[in-house]
């Protein structure tokens, strides 16, 4: 079939070899460049040939898609797809978020990484080099362009339509005309607007957006292709005079050189579009911009046809497009070549793509391995390239890897108008060889809660990936210093809690996006409290209950939440079964005369908990979230009511409630649920309110002797 298509394609090409040639030049302009699609559609519908194409920035994207056989319908479908928004926003599809390797969330604002290059040399990396995370673009440009690069052998003259794009060499202050090599790299360089998208290296030259020096490459069209007629589409303009209070206009004038957007009448026709209200990333306005370009071209069609006498049959164009697309080599990878990693690190990286050396794997395997490697932050960036070998009909996968610096300092916390303010500090060391390892020492300081924790982690790239973690932690709660909110009878609570524990955990991936975790730990807990609200601080001392516990657990965890706190998309789910055994000791603060200490009481119990939180988009701006939580514990009562309640299960769905002691939301068995109506202004701001209901299955009543009673009326909370 391919041979037949090729025969007809060459036959058709022979008839037009000496015919009038038409070149299409597309300017840059960000999302405004979607106008170009409407122009191409109008030209094709009227049988106007497009023999050559040159473009800059967004013009390079549209031009390259057409040059490798995309029809206007194909381009529209691509730009409308959910994938496209993820590509330019840097967000990862939920099914590729490898939760097993993700670090546990921490309240850090800043994570400053550095490395001791020499004995005393520290290299901090604080500011990002681009607004858009390149994690998606590094990979998707392989998916979009590598097969076309393979089909043309790296010669852009051999694409469906011969193509050129422009990038900028800011060091030598000149434009770069890209006519060969990796098509994805060429287009990526041409669109890398400074500070928005990360630049890439081409032949050891850092290449930026081509619009800096040549945003409308008619000169390249004339010099490289010599067409008889040029049709130009201009959706940009030279920067206006900078304004004192407009930082963007100042940057544009510093970065962008003036471009000649005209075409002499003797050479062709130019269509100029002026947009004052379209921003760089307004890709959701595709239909509007497409229609503007389409209608303008139709209005000028008589002028275009008077200059372009040759016509091409639409069926012939579709046939040539089909021939070219059918000859794109399918993705099948075998060998992996890695730059920027030592031999041990290379072995670790290769295990993510295939188990055996020279084993063939697919693009889907590449995609999953790519996101898995970037999930645990051992590697800061991976730039993949697919290099085609025509003899084996396979691709070599070339990976340019940048390892994360070994040391990090973290700073963060929680800022509130209440007394629940927290400061978070942490330091960490990480290293990757045959396996990845990480050591972290961090903690929080606050009026109510204080904590210090040492964590060590080792991840093994076995056939079933396995993670080992060791945690040693010390924390204190002082509930007396809490704020008195949302309660009719909020009496002072002179309670405090100290916790110390060590824990060993083993984690395995579970299903597509979850983690199974097994743990064994030992802890010492100490609760200090007064059983009466009438206290003489000169004489009375707090009662104390101490616990020495050995515990084991198995848990299943999964999350696709889009933020660490106040999420608007995704879900969080936890199912945990725990077994504890240990001893409890009670010491009264003011023992009566003749009091003898009670012996330590042994306790053993089972505890099972489940929690799920999920968010559903109900409209462009409205999201509805919900959560459900349930707890069952077979734990017996402690020596007294207060000790029992301090060790009971706690429903604390909000940041503030986690730092409060509220007996109304404590029980050994309970169910709870909540809804969260959210109005989303943008990615940074939202209005939300949360409503919760809580029902203890067997409420604990403060009687002469502790008793479980029948279920009581529900308690409610709102925030």
Residue ranges and their predicted role:
Residues 364, 369, 375, 381-561, ...:
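Gram-negative/organellar outer-membrane beta-barrel architecture
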Residues 18-56, 64-371, 375-380, 386-388, ...:
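Patatin-like phospholipase
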């Amino acid at each position: 079939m391919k041979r037949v298509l090729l025969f007809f394609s060459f036959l058709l090409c022979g008839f037009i070899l000496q015919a009038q040639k038409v070149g299409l030049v597309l300017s840059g302009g960000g999302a405004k460049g979607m106008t170009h699609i409407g122009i191409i559609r109008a030209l094709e519908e009227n049988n106007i040939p497009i023999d050559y194409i040159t473009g800059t920035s967004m013009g390079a994207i549209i031009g390259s898609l057409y040059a490798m056989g995309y029809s206007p319908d194909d381009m529209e479908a691509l730009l409308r797809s959910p994938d496209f928004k993820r590509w330019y926003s840097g967000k990862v599809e939920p099914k590729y978020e490898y939760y097993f390797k993700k670090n546990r969330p921490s309240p850090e604002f800043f994570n400053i990484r550095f490395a001791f290059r020499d004995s005393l040399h520290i290299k901090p990396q604080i500011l990002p080099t681009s607004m858009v995370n390149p994690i998606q673009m590094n990979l998707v440009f392989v998916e979009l362009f590598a097969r076309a690069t393979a089909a043309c052998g790296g010669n852009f003259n051999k694409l469906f339509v011969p193509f050129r794009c422009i990038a900028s060499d800011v060091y030598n202050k000149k434009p770069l005309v890209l006519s060969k090599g990796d098509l994805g790299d060429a287009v990526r360089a041409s669109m890398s607007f400074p500070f928005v998208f990360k630049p890439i290296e081409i032949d050891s030259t850092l290449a930026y957006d081509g619009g800096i020096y040549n945003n409308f490459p008619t000169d390249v069209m004339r010099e490289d292709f010599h067409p008889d007629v040029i049709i130009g589409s201009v959706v940009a303009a030279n920067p206006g005079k900078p304004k004192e209070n407009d930082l963007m206009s100042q940057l544009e004038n510093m970065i962008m050189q003036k471009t000649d957007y005209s075409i002499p009448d003797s050479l062709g026709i130019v269509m100029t579009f002026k947009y004052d209200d379209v921003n760089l990333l307004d890709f959701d306005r595709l239909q509007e911009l497409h229609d503007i370009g389409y209608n303008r071209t139709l209005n000028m069609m008589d002028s275009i046809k008077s200059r372009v006498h040759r016509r091409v049959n639409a069926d012939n164009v579709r046939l040539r497009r089909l021939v070219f697309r059918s000859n794109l080599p399918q993705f099948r990878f075998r060998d992996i070549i890695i730059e920027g990693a030592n031999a041990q690190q290379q072995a670790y990286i290769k295990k993510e793509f295939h188990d055996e050396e020279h084993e063939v794997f697919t693009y889907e395997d590449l995609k999953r391995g790519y996101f898995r490697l970037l999930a645990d932050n051992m590697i800061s960036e991976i730039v993949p390239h697919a290099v085609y070998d025509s003899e084996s009909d396979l691709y070599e996968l070339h990976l340019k890897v940048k390892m994360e610096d070994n040391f990090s300092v973290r700073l963060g916390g929680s800022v509130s108008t209440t007394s629940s303010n927290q400061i978070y500090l942490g330091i960490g060391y990480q290293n990757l060889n045959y396996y990845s390892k990480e050591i972290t020492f961090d903690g929080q300081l606050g009026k109510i809660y204080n904590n210090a924790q040492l964590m060590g982690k080792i991840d093994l790239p076995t056939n079933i990936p396995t993670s080992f973690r060791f945690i040693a932690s010390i924390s204190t709660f002082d509930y007396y210093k809490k704020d008195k909110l949302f309660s009719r009878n909020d009496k002072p609570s002179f309670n405090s809690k100290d916790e110390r524990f060590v824990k060993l955990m083993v984690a395995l991936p579970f299903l597509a996006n979850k983690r199974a975790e097994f743990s064994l730990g030992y802890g010492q807990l100490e609760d200090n409290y007064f059983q009466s609200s009438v206290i003489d601080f000169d004489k009375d001392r707090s009662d104390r209950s101490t616990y020495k516990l050995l515990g084991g657990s198995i848990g299943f965890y999964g999350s696709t939440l889009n933020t660490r706190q106040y999420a608007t998309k995704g879900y969080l789910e936890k199912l945990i079964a725990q077994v504890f055994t240990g001893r409890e000791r009670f010491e009264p603060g003011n023992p009566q005369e003749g009091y003898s200490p009670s012996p330590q009481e042994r306790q053993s119990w089972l505890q099972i908990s489940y929690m799920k939180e999920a968010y559903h988009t109900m409209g462009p701006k409205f999201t509805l979230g919900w959560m459900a939580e349930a707890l069952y514990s077979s734990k017996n009562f402690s020596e007294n009511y207060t000790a029992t309640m301090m060790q009971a299960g706690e429903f604390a769905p909000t940041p503030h409630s986690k730092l409060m002691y509220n007996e109304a939301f404590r029980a050994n068995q309970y169910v709870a649920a909540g809804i969260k109506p959210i109005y989303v202004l943008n990615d940074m701001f939202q209005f939300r309110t949360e409503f919760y209901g809580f029902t203890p299955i067997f409420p604990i009543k403060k009687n002469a002797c502790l008793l479980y009673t029948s279920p009581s009326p529900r308690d409610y909370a709102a925030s």
